[in-house]
UniProtKB/Swiss-Prot annotation:
Gene: rpsT
Upper lineage: Bacteria, Pseudomonadati, Pseudomonadota, Alphaproteobacteria, Rhodospirillales
Keyword Protein transport listed: no
Protein name: Small ribosomal subunit protein bS20
MF terms (GO), sorted A to Z: small ribosomal subunit rRNA binding; structural constituent of ribosome
Pfam families noted in UniProt: Ribosomal_S20p
Source organism (scientific name): Rhodospirillum rubrum (strain ATCC 11170 / ATH 1.1.1 / DSM 467 / LMG 4362 / NCIMB 8255 / S1)
Length: 88
C-alpha cells in the first residue's frame, strides 16, 4: 500500500482510468464483432455498413490511447480485405 498522499491518489486514479479503458476496448471489440458477423453471413452491404461504423471507433481507440496505431491500422486493413473478398 502506498504511503504518500499523492501515491494513494494515483492508485485511485489508475483504477478509474483502467475501468474506463477497459470499457473502451470492449466497445471496440463489440463493433469489430458486428463486422465479422456480417462478413460471416456473406452480406456485403451489411458488412460495409458495420465497417463504416466500426472504423471510427477503432481510430478513437488510438486517440484515447487504448490501441496502438499499427494495431488499429492492421485491424481496419484486414476487415476491409475480408469485406472486399465477399464479392470476389
Amino acid at each position: 500500500m502506498a504511503n504518500h498522499k499523492s501515491a494513494k491518489k494515483r492508485i485511485l486514479r489508475n483504477a478509474s482510468r483502467s475501468e474506463i479503458n477497459h470499457a473502451r476496448i470492449g466497445r471496440i471489440r463489440t463493433f469489430v464483432k458486428k463486422v465479422e458477423a456480417a462478413i460471416a453471413s456473406g452480406d456485403k452491404d451489411a458488412a460495409k455498413a458495420a465497417f463504416q461504423i466500426a472504423m471510427p471507433e477503432v481510430q478513437r481507440g488510438v486517440t484515447k490511447g487504448v490501441l496502438h496505431q499499427n494495431t488499429a491500422s492492421r485491424k481496419i486493413s484486414r476487415l476491409s480485405a475480408r469485406i472486399k473478398a465477399i464479392g470476389a
